[in-house]
């Protein structure tokens, strides 16, 4: 029934029409409003899937919630996988959010490989996307890396599917509430000891109150612009990166006068050159490299455990022997 509220959603229509319905998929089912709505969407669109739930045991109610989800899936005739991971006190870990996320994604990876699932459906929505983008802004991410989460993404070769990125949390909750469908309200989502919760409960309301407008949509527009910029930069960088050669010293990126005429593109090409060798270069490091290239002055720099040589006509990453 809920799905009728979204049956005229063109983005969902395009998304689901692109899927191979002969294949089987995996659904990350937390029991929250977003993943539960996604479960009903998949059923209504004729997608064959198995639900997987991870119970970390963080809350006293988590065991019963997992049992309730198992019962729900049994009633709906949806295959269900329950994975229990007992964590005595999540606050004993400084980065528990990322630790838990990494565990889930590794579980998804194993299941997809072992049971040949074509991909994993994730319930990330527009509010999650806005939070991700703002977090990256504050972290100083490159303009080409503010694109947020991808509707079609990958993790170690498995496909990640996020059809709800254009739908807000309010729309999801209203849809479920209107049809009296119960969902788990995870208290940790509002626990301000966690960064995401602080952003959700404090930062976004504060910024919107001061600014006087909803800031989520502009952030989503920023992500779209960033994705287009990233695509453009990659196209422009490709001819230069194709000139990388291996020599007796290491990998050599030629940098001619044509490229140096555009500082932004030069630094992007260098950034991707380093990244392809497993090196993440900071903004300051890239600026230093660019300054030496412009002055045609040689330099010997360290980037993590590698030596970078800036020459008059290019950049070399020394090989490790």
Curated annotation (Swiss-Prot):
GO terms for molecular function: ATP binding; tRNA(Ile)-lysidine synthase activity. It comes from the Bacteria. The keyword Membrane does not apply. One of its GO terms (cellular component) is cytoplasm. Its EC number is 6.3.4.19. GO terms for biological process: tRNA modification. The keyword Ligase applies. InterPro entries: Rossmann-like_a/b/a_fold, TilS/TtcA_N, tRNA_Ile_lys_synt, tRNA_Ile_lys_synt_N. It is found in: Cytoplasm. Signal peptide: none annotated. It catalyses: cytidine(34) in tRNA(Ile2) + L-lysine + ATP = lysidine(34) in tRNA(Ile2) + AMP + diphosphate + H(+). ATP binds at residues 30-35. Pfam families: ATP_bind_3. Keywords: ATP-binding, Cytoplasm, Ligase, Nucleotide-binding, tRNA processing. Belongs to the tRNA(Ile)-lysidine synthase family. The N-terminal region contains the highly conserved SGGXDS motif, predicted to be a P-loop motif involved in ATP binding. Ligates lysine onto the cytidine present at position 34 of the AUA codon-specific tRNA(Ile) that contains the anticodon CAU, in an ATP-dependent manner. Cytidine is converted to lysidine, thus changing the amino acid specificity of the tRNA from methionine to isoleucine. This is tRNA(Ile)-lysidine synthase. It comes from Chlamydia muridarum (strain MoPn / Nigg). The gene is tilS.
């Amino acid at each position: 029934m809920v799905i009728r509220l979204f049956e005229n959603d063109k983005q969902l229509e395009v998304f689901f029409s692109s899927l191979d319905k002969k294949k089987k998929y995996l659904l990350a089912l937390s029991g929250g409003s977003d993943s539960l709505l996604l479960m009903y969407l998949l059923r209504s669109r004729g997608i064959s899937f198995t639900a997987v739930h991870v119970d970390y045991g963080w809350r006293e109610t988590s065991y019963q919630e997992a049992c309730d989800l198992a019962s729900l899936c049994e009633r709906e005739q949806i295959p269900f996988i329950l994975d229990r991971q007992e964590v005595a006190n999540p606050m004993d870990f400084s980065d528990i959010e990322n630790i838990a996320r990494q565990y889930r994604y590794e579980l998804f990876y194993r299941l997809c490989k072992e049971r040949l699932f074509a991909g994993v459906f994730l319930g990330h929505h527009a509010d999650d996307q806005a939070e991700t983008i703002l977090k990256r802004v504050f972290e100083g991410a490159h303009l080409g890396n503010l694109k947020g989460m991808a509707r079609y993404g990958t993790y170690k070769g498995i496909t990640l599917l996020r059809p709800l990125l254009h739908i807000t949390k309010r729309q999801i909750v209203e849809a479920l509430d209107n049809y009296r469908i119960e969902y788990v309200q995870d208290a940790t989502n509002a626990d301000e000891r966690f960064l995401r919760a602080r952003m959700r409960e404090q930062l976004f309301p504060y910024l919107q109150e001061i600014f006087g407008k909803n800031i989520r949509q502009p952030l989503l527009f920023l992500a779209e612009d960033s994705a287009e910029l990233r695509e453009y930069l990659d196209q422009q960088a490709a001819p230069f990166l194709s000139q990388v050669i291996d020599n007796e010293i290491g990998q050599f990126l030629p940098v001619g006068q044509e490229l140096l005429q555009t500082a932004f593109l030069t630094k992007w090409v260098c950034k991707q050159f380093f990244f392809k060798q497993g090196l993440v270069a900071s903004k300051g490091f890239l600026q230093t490299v660019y300054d030496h290239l412009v002055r045609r002055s040689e330099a010997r720099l360290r980037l993590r455990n590698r030596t970078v040589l800036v020459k008059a006509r290019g950049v070399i990453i020394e090989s490790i022997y």
